[in-house]
Amino acid sequence: VHPDVRRMLLTQKCFAEGGRALVYLAAQQNDIVKKAESEEERKAADELLGFLTPIAKAFLTEAGYEATNLGVQVFGGHGFIAEWGMEQLVRDTKIACIYEGTTGIQALDLLGRKVLMTQGASLRNFTKIVHKFCQSVEGDEQMAQFAAPLAEVNKEWGDLTMKIGMTAMKNREEVGAASVDYLMYSGYATLAFLWARMAKV
């Protein structure tokens, strides 16, 4: 396989399988909300589900759109004609970025309501999960290539959030301006964690 074609196919695979893991994690939290034996467990799952929902909806629909665009590119000129159906898939995935809350609306929900309005509590709770995972694989040579960069991304996530929050106190437009990029960063960071966890298994 041509290296550039391999790059595109592996990107599609990353989004598809990582996205499935994200949806499973969200579904698991939903089950815990409904069946938790304690109020503390139910509340923690509900908070995590609320945090993950805009990431799952907006990041995965944007990733799906990117993946179908790559599909057109893999086919070359044939991807652009109706015979293969790729151009229809591009249209079908693009609408997912628009309905049930556009990417911009989901991004505002994540950054504005789920993160900044909680003074970063929901983000901290999730990044603690990631941090504990990174600590749990310390000393595992096979996991070092995944855990070290993941730990850096996890720390940077908190730093970026603080920087945006500080700027937003001076300029309210900052949240709207930064929200989509913040959501996409959050999506990549979340998928990085899930892929590292799958690599451990």
Which role does the model predict for each range below?
Residues V1-V201:
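Flavin-dependent oxidoreductase catalytic core characteristic
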